[in-house]
Amino acid sequence: MNNIHKTAIIEEGAILGDNITIGAFTIIGKNVKIGDGTIIDSHTLIDGKTTIGKNNHIFSHASIGTIPQDLKFNGEDVELIIGDNNKIREYTLFNPGTIGGGSVTKIGSNNLFMGYVHVAHDCIIGDNCIFANGATLAGHVECDDFVVVGGLTPIHQFCKIGTQVMIGGASAVAQDIPPFCLAEGNKAVLRGLNLTGLRRRFDNREDIDAIKHAYRELFEVGKPLQDVARELLDNDKNKYVKELASFVLNTKRGIPFNRK
């Protein structure tokens, strides 16, 4: 049974699952789908072609699914897809995709979006990520799983953030950040590996040691970056090293590190 406040507006055509809570003065648009067990607090707007999974909690004054902040947008059929078990805090802003970027913004599951986080058009976000207050993702940004972005940090459009990356607060990210790395600063540069995150996630110490060795070879010894990445991809048997090397070889915006 759903618990919908009498002042909430649910437009005809919206599809609601079971055991959903919708607070006072919230507006749900006609093309919205909401999965079982989701809680939507008061004064929230969910609009556009938006699909929200199960057991999410969307806090007050969030704006979800309103048209993208792209001057080229002209009313095309675009959408926003949100997975399960996300916590989306106050004053967050999520936009759908554009036809220039695949027409979809996609957010995974088990993420925490703190207050005032903006996820712009065509972003792709994985699972188990944390975005602290005021983090800003411009259009077409991709974040893999287990990413942590500090407060008040903007990420430039088209940047890709690898798995298990941690980015410090009040940084400015303008290039791609490889998996397992720390980045910080304005402009953000690599500051080593996210060893705390790696130790929490990996039981096998050999994996961590292999990633450490690969990081040194790539970013600390002064060899040509692409050559080292290609050698690691071809010859190293560790799957995480291969993931790191492949990311470096396929970067579109470059890697921000201090060259020797």
Curated annotation (Swiss-Prot):
Q: Which InterPro entries match?
A: Acetyltransf_C, Acetyltransf_C_sf, Hexapep, Hexapep_transf_CS, Lipid_A_LpxA, Trimer_LpxA-like_sf
Query: HAMAP family in the record, alphabetically?
Result: LpxA
Give the family from UniProt: Belongs to the transferase hexapeptide repeat family. LpxA subfamily.
State the encoding gene.
lpxA
Reactions accelerated catalytically: a (3R)-hydroxyacyl-[ACP] + UDP-N-acetyl-alpha-D-glucosamine = a UDP-3-O-[(3R)-3-hydroxyacyl]-N-acetyl-alpha-D-glucosamine + holo-[ACP]
Give EC number(s), comma-separated: 2.3.1.129
Domain of life of the source: Bacteria
Report TM segments. Answer: none
Write one Pfam family the protein is assigned to.
Acetyltransf_11
Quote the subcellular location field of this record.
Cytoplasm
Functional summary from the UniProt entry: Involved in the biosynthesis of lipid A, a phosphorylated glycolipid that anchors the lipopolysaccharide to the outer membrane of the cell.
From which source organism is this entry? Aliarcobacter butzleri (strain RM4018)
| Subcellular location, principal | cytoplasm
Q: Which GO terms describe its biological process?
A: lipid A biosynthetic process
GO CC, sorted alphabetically, is: cytoplasm; membrane
The alphabetized UniProt keywords are:
Acyltransferase, Cytoplasm, Lipid A biosynthesis, Lipid biosynthesis, Lipid metabolism, Repeat, Transferase
What is the protein's quaternary organization?
A: Homotrimer.
Report the GO molecular function annotations.
acyl-[acyl-carrier-protein]-UDP-N-acetylglucosamine O-acyltransferase activity
Major enzyme class:
transferase
Pathway-wise, it operates in: Glycolipid biosynthesis; lipid IV(A) biosynthesis; lipid IV(A) from (3R)-3-hydroxytetradecanoyl-[acyl-carrier-protein] and UDP-N-acetyl-alpha-D-glucosamine: step 1/6
Record protein name field? Acyl-[acyl-carrier-protein]--UDP-N-acetylglucosamine O-acyltransferase
NCBIfam families from the entry? lipid_A_lpxA, PRK05289.1
